[in-house]
Amino acid sequence: MGLEGASGAISSLCLPGLSQFTWLQYRYANLLQPSQFHGEPCNFSDKEVEDCVTSRPCRSQVRCEGFVCAQTGRCVNRRLLCNGDNDCGDQSDEANCRRIYKKCQHEMDQYWGIGSLASGINLFTNSFEGPVLDHRYYAGGCSPHYILNTRFRKPYNVESYMPQTQGKYEFILKDYESYSDFERKVTEKTASRSGFSFGFKMPGIFELGISSQSDRGKHYIRRTKRFSHTKSVFLHARSDLEVAHYKLKPRSLMLHYEFLQRVKRLPLEYSYGEYRDLFRDFGTHYITEAVLGGIYEYTLVMNKEAMERGDYTLNNVHACAKNDFKIGGAIEEVYVSLGVSVGKCRGILNEIKDRNKRDTMVEDLVVLVRGGASEHITTLAYQELPTADLMQEWGDAVQYNPAIIKVKVEPLYELVTATDFAYSSTVKQNMKQALEEFQKEVSSCHCAPCQGNGVPVLKGSRCDCICPVGSQGLACEVSYRKNIPIDGKWNCWSNWSSCSGRRKTRQRQCNNPPPQNGGSPCSGPASETLDCS
């Protein structure tokens, strides 16, 4: 474990009225080697801040033609003073009012999930961070928006928030004859996008994955990874429920005052440490469009040899699972019409409920539920296949507590405009440069390989191994399975080459670890090329 020292920069914290100005100066350190396998993590801060005095003048600010808020520094239109809303974010627009002229006479709710939609998102970890947009700012607007007889107030930043009609709860079932197929088509969709690299622009709307650092992410990895390079087959079922579509205004956004002040304090002289702290606290991107709702998915892991002994096919399992949800096992004739005997279907369904038997067909039931957070629903979901009643209960909960399941995003630096910030082009360019450094620093490629197909996760200055069920130890080195195939994993990207012919390139190697004992090679490109100038 080690930190590399680096020089810092000076950033202004100007106090008007003094002959000299108080500034802050910083220095920071980069992570050279994370700790792992019980090594000591870095036990000191990777940055230092102290006051300094200089005769350098304060950085100029964007001129405000309206009212300058006392604490937040926000510039608001004077027509918003004394209207009963906290337009400043610090109530200074409502101070010293002889009379309050309330724009809204009735209480109105906030849109479901609107707080998360205003947050920045770290796409390297799929985690929501601090607020970058102010979705409690209405600019005096008060037209009610009715959804299911509930009156909502539309924030100034929001272009549209459209409810979606709740349809039937239907599962789409797909089967996979090997873990490698299952991982490529299913598991990798839930992973965070730590490897994206096309200028940090994400084209189109995409599904938001599960953070491998979250409890749910770790649980899912442990339960599914144990079946890598086994003779198991997989039946994956998924039901999507959309309750609302969200779209942000394309321009003239009201930034959250905390984010506004942090960006104003960034040094114009490039210093990675301060920009890194911004990404840590506010994420790497912000959401421009989103689908809110829920995803209910489960995976049945079946023992292929046990299925053959019992004269079962994957199609039999597929038919029994699909139709048990529809009829709840009540109409025996339906199974016969599917070409599956009642006894066969009962055998499969009973094994799902009692997975403590030895040498059974059903090796595991792995469930992942997003949206409709409820301890009661989650407990039921992890015990058995979903029923119509459970899905109805889950759907009702999703309506009022939806998850953000799909997003369209823009890099955080796109919020830095000349409307709010002086020297915006300089700050924006610094943020672009820092984002590339940040991606390198937080990548788990810095971790030593975990054994037994364990998954390394870098958190802070420490690497941990998420071990498949059946493996344990700091490096997943204790396992009942011997000489198993080891899948290859990528090492870190090299630095970009210098710009030549308006192109630059970088490479990486599949050696962390390399494939062993017939394991799968790394997926994805070994080199990348980008335009440059």
Pin down the residues of each PLM region.
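Membrane-permeabilization and membrane-interfacing ectodomains
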Residues: 99-451, 457
